[in-house]
């Protein structure tokens, strides 16, 4: 395998803007490790590695750190493909353990840079590699700036090596004018603008036929010849380049890169190339590091532990996100609503709420979602899959979060407590929903009628009133409902199930809301009060009916005669007058009959012809007699309303 060497200008970091230099350096290493047809040289892991100090590491954000980790590990895997290493680099060990790479950097003395010697090299020896015992795995890579090797050049050698300095793996004959020199010992240091330069004039022997010029070596920077700045056009171009400039442009998205290898790496995201495949399940990944993390799912390995609660994770990035729960840190803020998030992926998903973007579409029904997990969960409606099963009762669920909430029913755990009324809940979402009863907040508005709701699910059910959609059908009787909850309650009519028992009188109910209303009989609670007269009611619909007395509203109209009624039950009774087709004199309003008729009074009149009539149904008795005996002196004719 062949990988391109970083271009010479990439090895020199600008000291004018440390943050920009770090970003550029990090972007550049993402291009290493891809093939290009150039001349070759041997390369060790150090040649494709970039280290950071603790201060520099702190300037990188999470995506940049993740990119650094992915590229470093992938480059190491590429080196391994050519043969087993003598030892694993420390930075790789730290990255695999999820540790920060700056923590392993050794201290480097701040003394004078070890001397370098430039010697004349015969033309026939140019470009010849002088091998020394290698201490790291090496491989062939194309060399940037190949044209330099065809010219008269000097040889770069270390004349004196400090006892604590690591031995280099390779030594090359380098053209002094064309290739900036770099001290490998101080490669990781950063020297500010105007930093001290070390004069190495005594170690420079001019090449025959060239003007002598002192080479000045900056600690941690590249050697250059100040008297001949034009000898380093590549460095000058790199430092003078703007932040948005680039030579290689992506045809898909227009993003520009300084190296063609960086562009090749970027194209993976468009092509979705997944070269790394799991042997267990066959799932493929774009990066080798993603495959390593995925394998921990099969092995169950969770090497990263939270120091606060002891929770373990298979991925270090997951641990970092988790630790923000303890610290309360939320560094990712939405510019539209100022809502903050602990993870950049959560912010990306949240932004789709504002944009309305729903990129994930169901192939079965065409429904679209703004999150892939929502689409995966939706697919289970079509397949009927419920992979998450409760170990206590065996009940299965389509998503893991529902199982987690359900398990708290068995454990009795209710960790989320309302600060207003001290009521506790087993999930944060239910607490949030409950708190809106105190604040009166109804953030979800219907676009058709403007009605507000405290929960998005309630709004979805309400919208079906306007659309007439009833997607939930009973298999027993074929009746359809707009909500799945209504269907569940309806099914109990067929099964006779009444799972909600009153603890006071042991009366059972098929739905929980009916139990709550019933319990108000025992407690005497009447939470719904009329603002006009102060009368209180135990149920909200009773208050709504009562308020029509004050407003005079009659919203129910008879289609036959146009008469208006304030209650739907009154309209239903009125419509019987039209449907039965009998004389008005023998039609009786069931409500009025039950109000003015005293059961048993007809049979008590001594009429022998009516002794076999069942006295339970007062309406049938009245139809037979066509007479309603008055109460205590009240007289009114048949078919007329009683006088007040």
Swiss-Prot record:
A GO term for molecular function: DNA-binding transcription factor activity, RNA polymerase II-specific
SUPFAM superfamilies: beta-beta-alpha zinc fingers, KRAB domain (Kruppel-associated box)
Tissue-specificity statement: Highly expressed in the fetal brain.
Entry keyword Protease: no
ZnF endpoints (C2H2-type): 248-270, 276-298, 304-326, 332-354, 360-382, 388-410, 416-438, 444-466, 472-494, 500-522, 528-550, 556-578
SMART domains named in the record: KRAB (SM00349), ZnF_C2H2 (SM00355)
Span of domain KRAB: 43-114
Primary location recorded for the protein, binned into one broad class: nucleus
InterPro entries, per the entry: KRAB (IPR001909), KRAB_dom_sf (IPR036051), Znf_C2H2_sf (IPR036236), Znf_C2H2_type (IPR013087)
Lineage top rank: taxon: Eukaryota
Gene3D superfamilies recorded: 6.10.140.140, Classic Zinc Finger
Pfam families (alphabetical): KRAB, zf-C2H2
Intracellular or extracellular location(s): Nucleus
GO cellular component: actin cytoskeleton; nucleoplasm; nucleus
Cross-linked sites for Glycyl lysine isopeptide (Lys-Gly) (interchain with G-Cter in SUMO2): 582
Record bears the keyword Ubl conjugation: yes
Keywords: DNA-binding, Isopeptide bond, Metal-binding, Nucleus, Repeat, RNA-binding, Transcription, Transcription regulation, Ubl conjugation, Zinc, Zinc-finger
Single GO BP term: regulation of DNA-templated transcription
UniProt function note: May play a role in RNA metabolism.
Family: Belongs to the krueppel C2H2-type zinc-finger protein family.
PANTHER family: TRANSCRIPTIONAL REPRESSOR PROTEIN YY, ZINC FINGER PROTEIN 143
Name of the protein: Zinc finger protein 74
Organism: Homo sapiens (Human)
